[in-house]
């Protein structure tokens, strides 16, 4: 059973949940992380123990929440889901922990956003399965230890570097999720289309995968939008031409760049001479949060060689200039003699 301790989900969230695989066998990609988890889960089940605490990190949309739910399904236990910003006070976390049952999975998304005070409650809970409760105030205050059922904490984060060392060290399993290949995404898109009762041609699935930035969440989102286009203008069949026409209207180019990707790169190239330029300066220039640029847009641009992150700031690469048809500037020549 899944219990979500977060605000109500939207219709798109509910639809996204129906597309998620329910077992490791159905989960596509992330072979290294999946293979390790399969071994750890089988070993824990064989010993009749709770799975060790798991930290999943990587760019958004790669399947961290899906893996957390699969872990619970494979272990045959309940999962309770929440997120770091929702847990504002130690009492909030204490209430969640005391309602867990033996071997339950507690999933905390954006775990890097837990406050330091809340983290302090987690340390003994993760290590000793105990909750330290302070009764009274001032000199008469005393601490009692409340035993907790053995549970598995699954934490997800896009910014593992922001986790404190004491918290990170308490995770027994740490897995990084990588961007997906075009072949993996095409398989996911075909599977999602089948679940949604849609007909999609192989070349249409491949083209959609190519423009999905290596991210299943984006692939499924674009699939839903292309489905609308196919339903209205193409008899409900998703072909290569349908995908190309629909994504042209959505301003998604052949590399998967959307409006914001183009804004980031063109701002660096046209306004700041290709860089280096600071992240906060870019954010101010395009009216976007610096955290959003760093977490959502930069990983894809950097991994695909369009952006460099240097100590002095962000720099557009030769590939970025060529993508937009800009002339690549010549590197400055050093002077032989000083004036």
Curated annotation (Swiss-Prot):
Binding site for Mg(2+): 65
Nucleotide-binding is among the record's keywords: yes
Superkingdom of the source species: Bacteria
Reaction catalyzed: ATP + H2O = ADP + phosphate + H(+)
GO cellular component, one term: Holliday junction resolvase complex
Cellular localisation: Cytoplasm
InterPro entries in UniProt: AAA+_ATPase, AAA_lid_4, DNA_helicase_Holl-junc_RuvB, P-loop_NTPase, RuvB-like_N, RuvB_C, WH-like_DNA-bd_sf, WH_DNA-bd_sf
Head domain (RuvB-H) as annotated region, ranges: 254-339
EC number assigned by the record: 3.6.4.-
Binding positions for DNA per the UniProt entry: 309, 314
Swiss-Prot/TrEMBL GO biological process terms: DNA recombination; DNA repair
Molecular function terms from GO: ATP binding; ATP hydrolysis activity; four-way junction DNA binding; four-way junction helicase activity
Main localization (coarse): cytoplasm
Binding site for ATP: 19-20, 61, 64-66, 127-129, 170, 180, 217
Membership in a protein family: Belongs to the RuvB family.
Self-association state and partner proteins as the record states: Homohexamer. Forms an RuvA(8)-RuvB(12)-Holliday junction (HJ) complex. HJ DNA is sandwiched between 2 RuvA tetramers; dsDNA enters through RuvA and exits via RuvB. An RuvB hexamer assembles on each DNA strand where it exits the tetramer. Each RuvB hexamer is contacted by two RuvA subunits (via domain III) on 2 adjacent RuvB subunits; this complex drives branch migration. In the full resolvosome a probable DNA-RuvA(4)-RuvB(12)-RuvC(2) complex forms which resolves the HJ.
HAMAP family in the record: DNA_HJ_migration_RuvB
Job description of the protein: The RuvA-RuvB-RuvC complex processes Holliday junction (HJ) DNA during genetic recombination and DNA repair, while the RuvA-RuvB complex plays an important role in the rescue of blocked DNA replication forks via replication fork reversal (RFR). RuvA specifically binds to HJ cruciform DNA, conferring on it an open structure. The RuvB hexamer acts as an ATP-dependent pump, pulling dsDNA into and through the RuvAB complex. RuvB forms 2 homohexamers on either side of HJ DNA bound by 1 or 2 RuvA tetramers; 4 subunits per hexamer contact DNA at a time.
Protein name in UniProt: Holliday junction branch migration complex subunit RuvB
High-level lineage: Bacteria, Pseudomonadati, Thermodesulfobacteriota, Desulfuromonadia, Geobacterales
Gene that produces this protein: ruvB
